[in-house]
Regions:
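Conserved beta-strand-loop surface patch within small alpha/beta domains used
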Residues: 1-45, 52-143
């Protein structure tokens, strides 16, 4: 799944958005919602998940991550300590940085807006697989 992080210049805080998206085991297709006015908000970072695979920047990521911003990928999300990789991009030049420079503190599992659950559509999913995904997203299995 994909999370967009915006900096609110007026209120001096970060705002998270889970855009509508279609996800498969290997890809995410989403659109920028347009509800964050560029006069007030800076699209600061994109975070996406590699689910239970390792956290790494793929060739697809290299091709897609064109904007000057921070990019993060989270992997091994079922592990007690998931993997996180972070980099800064500018004109297809990338510099990996320590994730602790970007992230501080941890939000408790399940502590997110309910509408995020309906923003992610799993391609080729069954009702059972969608329920399992939502349970993982909410942290109900101790994740």
């Amino acid at each position: 799944a994909l999370v967009n992080v915006y900096w609110d210049k007026q209120d001096s805080c970060f705002v998270l958005e889970v855009p509508e998206q279609k996800v498969t085991r290997t890809s995410i297709s989403s659109r920028i919602s347009g509800k964050f006015d560029s006069g007030r908000f800076i699209h600061y970072m994109d975070i996406h998940s590699h689910n239970n695979m390792n956290a790494f920047f793929s060739r697809t990521d290299d091709r897609d991550e064109k904007a000057a911003r921070v990019y993060a990928v989270v992997g091994r999300i079922s592990s007690f300590f998931p993997e996180i990789k972070v980099r800064i991009a500018n004109s297809r030049s990338f510099v990996e940085i320590d994730p602790s420079v970007v992230f501080e503190g941890i939000v408790a599992a399940g502590d997110f807006p309910e509408e995020w659950k309906t923003a992610v559509f799993l391609e080729n999913s069954t009702p059972d697989s969608r329920q399992e995904f939502l349970k993982q997203l909410a942290g109900s299995d101790g994740i």
